Amino acid sequence: MFVFLALITLTTCLQIPLNPTIDDFYNPPKDLETSQLGDVLKWRKMPFPVTSMFVNLPISNAWQISVRSQDTLNNSLAIVATILEPPNGDKNKLISHQAFENSPLLSCSPSYSMQVPSFETFQIQADLIFISGLLSQGWYVVVPDYEGPNSVFPVGRQSAYSVLDSIRGTIKFFNSTGNSTVKTALLGYSYGAVASLWASIVQPNYAPELELVGAAVGCTIPNITAFIEKVDEGPYSGLIVNIFNGLANEYRHFRDRLIHFGALQPLGCLFPICRKFFFQKMIGGVYDAQVLTDETIKETIEINNLLSTRAVPQIPVFLFHSKFNEMSPFLEILKLEKLWCSQLGVNLEIAEDMSYNHMVEAFSGMPAAITWIEKRWNNSTLGGCKHVHRLSNFEYPGIAPFLSQYFRSSLQMVLNNNRYFNNTTR
């Protein structure tokens, strides 16, 4: 009790929100089991302002909701999501933005990180640049903690359940009956893209009542093993630790087997863990060289691969990806395109460009994604599969000049902010 009180006192003195690990709002209520999927269990005004180290956000109101969801074994969970209201916003247009948390630790979750600008929360701070662009369109935004209370990065189906139940909860928050004319678009980058696509795949059976107009995603990861092999011995080697730790959080058999291939590594947010393992050899170094060929490890990874499921999105998908992405191999995108487009009813547009790295690709593709979503609100006709090559996705037709300028200048600002990126090389 003394330690708990001391932590609360310290948090109050420093004027930062309570860490989710000691914040009772993140704990499920006693009536969790009697609630329905998507029910709002608790809600509150955002304890502290949403704060970005890069941009000002056009926010009129911000709330956090706790929503009933479930894990991959259908066990009940309480998921926290953040709802952001823009000035003069249109409540009938909702973006579910899946942040690229990429971390197996609750204190890295978007609901907390967007209130605490720091090196530890840098990935969510960068994502707030994109969220600001969405709010400037007059769209409501919900940002789910889709990894859940156990931080199960990168578990596909639980991510999907959390996303869909957070949308349900947001609609119920504004309309207690849950019946509304709200149109929702899914948006995400990096693993946020994977969560968005899994949500689009399971939605017809899991949440058929939701009116999803489409999913706009960038740099998705169709094959986790190929991703691991690509980032190993590079600046983002630490992501391999986060992937293994996140899967271990969800699957006990995976955790028990992983120990045979190396000691369990510390939990951490994306950038601190990448700094710790900067350019280290992970497979055949930190972990035994045979870790990816072990049947338990391999099977657990495969069930979370987009390429391992025959189910396909039943809503239109816009996917932007650089041919030169240094983290998610473009060959895997082509495999996904072939798999999906071989099936009837798939509506997929791929915007391929020549952005020279993962971060630049995010900024060049996001204005195209927003432009594509704007057309989806208006039910513009789409059909079949389309794959277009461009030098840069800044050249995507119809992008508003102010939107292009906002993302170009934001990219330059992030590149110039060396005091954060330099941390990864120390």
From Swiss-Prot:
Enzyme Commission no: 3.1.1.3
Superkingdom classification of source: Eukaryota
Disulfide topology: C108-C269, C341-C385
Signal peptide: 1-15
Reaction catalyzed: a triacylglycerol + H2O = a diacylglycerol + a fatty acid + H(+)
Glycosylation sites: N74, N175, N179, N223, N378, N379, N422, N423
Keyword terms: Disulfide bond, Glycoprotein, Hydrolase, Lipid degradation, Lipid metabolism, Signal, Virulence
InterPro entries, A to Z: AB_hydrolase_fold (IPR029058), Lipase_secreted (IPR005152)
GO BP, sorted A to Z: lipid catabolic process
SUPFAM superfamilies, per the entry: alpha/beta-Hydrolases
A single MF term (Gene Ontology): triacylglycerol lipase activity
Catalytic residue list: S190, H358
Induction: Expression is not induced in medium containing Tween 40 as the sole source of carbon. Expression is up-regulated during the yeast-to-hyphal transition. Expressed in host cecum and infected mucosal tissues (stomach, hard palate, esophagus and tongue).
PANTHER family, alphabetized: LIPASE 5, PTHR34853
Its biological purpose: Secreted lipase that is able to hydrolze both the neutral triacylglycerols and the monopalmitate ester Tween 40, allowing the use of hydrolyzed products as carbon sources. Has broad lipolytic activity, which may be important for colonization and subsequent infection, therefore contributing to the persistence and virulence in human tissue.
Entry similarity comment: Belongs to the AB hydrolase superfamily. Lipase family. Class Lip subfamily.
Protein name as annotated: Lipase 7
Annotated source species: Candida albicans (strain SC5314 / ATCC MYA-2876)
